[in-house]
Each structure stands twice: as C-alpha cells, then as structure tokens.
Amino acid sequence: DQHSQFSGICNPKGRLLASFRVFHCGDSYYLCLPSSMIETVISRLRRFMLRSKVTLEEASDTFVHLGVSGSEAEQALRNVAGTLPDNIHEVTQNKDQAIIRVPGIHPSFEIFTTTEQARQLWSSLNVQSAPVGSIAWQFLDIQAGIPMIFPETREAFVPQMANLQLIDGVSFTKGCYTGQEIVARMQYLGKLKRRMYRARCESTTQPLAGDEVYVSGEGTQSVGKLVSAAPHPDGGYSMLAVLQISSAEGKSRLHLGSASGAVITLEHLPYPFPSE
C-alpha cells in the first residue's frame, strides 16, 4: 500500500503495449496511463482474467488526478495535505486519496482524490502555485526521462530501448509475464542497439510521438522514433526519443522528420547509462 510501481505490459515479442504507474488504494489496484491507451490495456488484461474473481474497468471517473511540482512544492503540499511520502514511488493515502512521490527535476507529487477534496486542494494551492495544463506535466515526465507509450508507439520498443531497466520499471527476477523470454534474452545475451535519449528541437511544428528521426546525409533511413514531446518553457520542444546508439553518439547531426528537418540536440538524462 505504501509503494507504487512504474511498469509496462508487453506483447509476446517483448514489445511494449503500454507503460503506466500502478498503485493500490482501498481494495483495488489502479493503473495510471494516457487515456488513449485505456482500451488497449483493458482488452489485453481481460485475456488473462479467466475465472479469477477480478473485475476490470475504466476508473477515470473514480478520482480527480492532480500533479504538483516545483522547488517549493513539497512544503506547499504538506501545508494543505499533511503527511507526504519521503521517497520516490512511495505512497501516502487514506480511504479516498492517494499521494505518490514521483521522479522529477524538482519535488513532484501525483494526487488521486475525490472531487470535493480536489476542490479544496486546488483552492489552497492556487494561492502560491500556478495552474498549468497536462502538457506541462508531460514536459516534466520528459525531463525526468519517464517514457509513456502512446498509440503511435505501441509495440515499437522493448523495455530496455525505453530505459525501463534504468528506472526500476522492469524485473528480471519475478515470475512469468508475456514477452519475458525476449526481454530477459536482451538483458543477459543481447547487445542493445537502441536506447532512449532526451533531446531538444526548435521545430516550427509540434513534434508528435512516433515521428521519425534521421541523420544528415543518410537519405530516407530512419535512425529512431520519438517517444513523446512537449513544448519547452524556453522555446522549442523537449523530447524523448529511442535512437540507434551508433547514430546518437556519432558525429552527424540528427534531424526530425527527414534528413533536412529541424536539428535535434541531445541532452543529459537525470540518470546514467550503464556505460557512463
């Protein structure tokens, strides 16, 4: 009850169908993921219910979902919500509210609560905090190197390509799960040729999940794919992209959409790659 888990679900070939955060509240487990992925996950999980005494349903109307982040976020939230989780992924909760501490460049919390409590929190936090849209939270996920799978990237990556092994998002010791053989083989026997990088781009149009990445002078052969993208407060766009390691760490420029598209500049993730 005091721990959440960032995770994913794979197809038999070990490719990610979705990524999400799992937490327990009351007598249920909840998965937090993009609304566009709900039907995919429900349809997949229903295959494994068999005769189990389990119900599976969309829970979008169960909670109001809020995010609070910033250098003063912890104290501001503590003043109105009381006890907060101390460590990343930990959860504090009562019968109808859960607060999860999540990775971020600043202290960051996700809150799942009732409509009435959400109104009270919003009113109290709005005194010193600035309300922003969900796209701003997507930017924070990108800065933290947290990959969310969307319909455009469904089944495009094995977990290691999206860095799940670096953010405690995949287990190599637990029991069977779909695609486990492929995922384990990649971890212990394979050589990873693609992984996820954080990047910046001054594109004149909004980059989208699934957009292709190219290298200068290499024609129409894509070397990677965007995982997610969001406007950067200082202009341009911040992105996560799964790229060929050889291309990302080579000397040629990376471009969005075509070999002559907007230039992509790589940035450091907040966690190291194993070789670093």
Language-model segments: what does each one mean?
Residues 21-144:
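Acidic, low-complexity central loop/insert segments
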Residues 162-170, 184-276:
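Glycine-rich, small/acidic residue-mixed loop/short-helix segments
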Residues 2-3, 84-92, 206-212, 251:
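Glycine-centered loop/turn motifs
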Residues 1-19, 23:
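Acidic, proline/glycine-enriched N-terminal capping motif
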Residues 110-200:
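Anionic-ligand-binding alpha/beta catalytic cores of soluble enzymes and soluble regulatory domains
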Residues 59, 102, 145, 175, ...:
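Residue-level recognition of beta-strand microenvironments
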